[in-house]
């Protein structure tokens, strides 16, 4: 049996392992990050950048393994994400904590595979994001999110007649929907309407909503991002349609949309591995540190990135890699180490990884109440 190394974040510092690898002053691994800092998905990139910086500062303060971190904007665009990757390579990147969203992550994953660069995406959930042996993820995959959502709805008897509105042009959205539909049948749920939109037509959802309403949908499943979700909630309210709404991690950020009446988000449920209102010391310390440094409450994407940085630290310590090694040699050692560590993180206790890049962790459900995310699993 492989020996397991267990770490927790500095938010639970009393249990932190001390690095067994010696690092001279000035020696540091260069970790790059890529994600949207501008555009419709910017809240995700900003959260990942902030939380990674927070983790890096904490880790460096310990005096053991050291990291430098640089983050590049990709505007949630695949081509720009590859350009950002090349910019980070020019900087001297040795590992990538990214990218943030799925389509850009797939494009960049092809580049990291060619370079044999270690890649850990905090939130790229499409299956293809970790198709290569050098790539791992912190978040749940799209199929896992889809199946878990159907299971949660069915097991908690939230509804039996389900409407779905999804983006058929987006790998994240369509991937979740496909697995949701499969598991819904196993749960005895009836999908009474399943209506798609595309990236070229994502402002008017009246047709999709009307079909769900006419079909008697009691709950509308939204495996989409928060910007489109805010429009759907607004338009549903205008037409007097008030079903339950349930989504996945893409809805995280809904309360930050400019001009959106957040009262319309009351009661919205989403499946996520992180709830900022959790009362464990690790979460409370992280939320307090994040709010002090950046203002605002951290979303799941921030927690994913924070856990990801500590996973990289654990794998570095386990593998014994040093900053003077080649990118390829670092990657080979990190691949093995990732399957031998256990991380007690914000998004899961006892988190481990399989050789296929997938994490082993438990989902949680949260509900928006009075403008905040409240755990439904307390």
Language-model-detected regions and their locations in the chain:
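Alpha-helical transmembrane segments
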Residues: 4-11
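Hydrophobic core
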Residues: 12, 16-17
């Amino acid at each position: 049996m492989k020996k397991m190394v267990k770490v927790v974040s500095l938010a639970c510092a009393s249990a932190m392992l001390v690095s067994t690898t010696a690092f001279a002053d000035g020696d540091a691994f260069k970790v790059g990050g890529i994600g949207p800092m501008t555009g419709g998905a910017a809240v995700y990139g900003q959260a990942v950048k902030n939380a990674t910086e927070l983790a890096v500062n904490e880790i460096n303060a310990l005096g053991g393994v050291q990291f430098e971190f640089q983050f590049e904007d990709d505007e949630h665009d695949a081509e720009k994400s590859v350009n950002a990757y090349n910019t980070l390579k020019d900087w001297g990147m040795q590992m990538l904590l990214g990218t943030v969203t799925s389509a850009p992550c797939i494009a960049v994953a092809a580049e990291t595979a060619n370079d044999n660069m270690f890649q850990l995406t905090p939130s790229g959930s499409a299956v293809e994001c970790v198709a290569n042996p050098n790539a791992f993820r912190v978040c749940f995959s799209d199929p896992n999110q889809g199946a878990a959502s159907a299971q949660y709805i069915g097991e908690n008897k939230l509804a039996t007649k389900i409407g779905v509105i999804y983006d058929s042009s987006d790998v994240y959205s369509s991937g979740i929907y496909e697995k949701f539909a499969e598991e819904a049948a196993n749960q005895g749920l009836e999908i009474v309407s399943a209506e798609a939109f595309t990236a070229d037509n994502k402002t008017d959802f009246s047709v999709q909503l009307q079909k769900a309403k006419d079909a008697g949908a009691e709950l509308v499943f939204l495996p989409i991002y928060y910007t489109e979700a805010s429009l759907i909630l607004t338009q549903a309210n205008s037409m007097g349609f008030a079903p339950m709404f349930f989504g996945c991690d893409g809805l995280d950020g809904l309360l930050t949309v400019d001009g959106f009446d957040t009262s319309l988000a009351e009661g919205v449920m989403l499946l996520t591995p992180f709830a900022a209102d959790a009362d464990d010391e690790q979460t409370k310390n992280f939320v307090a540190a994040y709010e002090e440094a950046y203002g605002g409450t951290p979303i799941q994407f921030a927690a994913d990135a924070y856990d990801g940085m500590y996973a990289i630290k654990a794998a570095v310590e386990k593998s014994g890699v040093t900053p003077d090694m080649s990118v390829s040699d670092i990657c080979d050692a990190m691949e093995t180490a990732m399957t031998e560590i256990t991380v007690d993180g914000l998004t899961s206790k006892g988190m481990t990884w399989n050789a296929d890049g997938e994490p082993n962790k438990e989902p949680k459900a949260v509900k928006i109440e009075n403008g905040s995310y409240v755990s439904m699993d307390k």
